[in-house]
Amino acid sequence: MSRIGNKVVVLPAGVEIKQDGNNITVKGPKGELTREFSSDIKMNIEGNEVTFIRPNDSKEMKTIHGTTRANFNNMVVGVSEGFQKALELIGVGYRAQVQGNKLTLNVGYSHPVEMTAPEGVTFEVPANTQVIVKGINKEVVGELAANIRGVRPPEPYKGKGIRYVGEFVRRKEGKTGK
């Protein structure tokens, strides 16, 4: 059984936290994140260490305990280091361009696909077949990267499509002729 909720979250230098009822605000060098947490879980701050305490050991409380700690840790890592997801475009003529906060993908459709970055998220295109999504909120970065991948998921026969860097795509054999 996981015991993530019992682990201590160590605050790096330059990260401040503020608690206002159930809302916790984490402020750091990269930005500021606010999130509402369960009122059942109590937060205990000692110096630069934060622990979370649950009222009882019921299964429901254990799940909320671990989730609360993991979400808080993601907020701390996000405002101090940030998160990024890298994608690659594989296919003839597949390319990406960024203009301001708009990403334009040419991935074999009759029209280019445009995506707009939400607030706090940026796109980088180091090469015209690579896209890097960066931001401080792990959930938003992951969801946006998944939406970009969903425009043209990798297909199993030729391997064409948009995939995460390092993602393994299981290949299939084509039909065999007579």
Curated annotation (Swiss-Prot):
Transmembrane segments: none annotated. GO terms for cellular component: cytosolic large ribosomal subunit. It comes from the Bacteria. GO terms for biological process: cytoplasmic translation. InterPro entries: Ribosomal_uL6-like, Ribosomal_uL6-like_a/b-dom_sf, Ribosomal_uL6_a/b-dom, Ribosomal_uL6_bac-type, Ribosomal_uL6_CS. SUPFAM superfamilies: Ribosomal protein L6 (SSF56053). Keywords: Ribonucleoprotein, Ribosomal protein, RNA-binding, rRNA-binding. The keyword Ribonucleoprotein applies. GO terms for molecular function: rRNA binding; structural constituent of ribosome. PROSITE patterns: RIBOSOMAL_L6_1 (PS00525). The keyword Ribosomal protein applies. This protein binds to the 23S rRNA, and is important in its secondary structure. It is located near the subunit interface in the base of the L7/L12 stalk, and near the tRNA binding site of the peptidyltransferase center. Part of the 50S ribosomal subunit. Belongs to the universal ribosomal protein uL6 family. This is Large ribosomal subunit protein uL6.
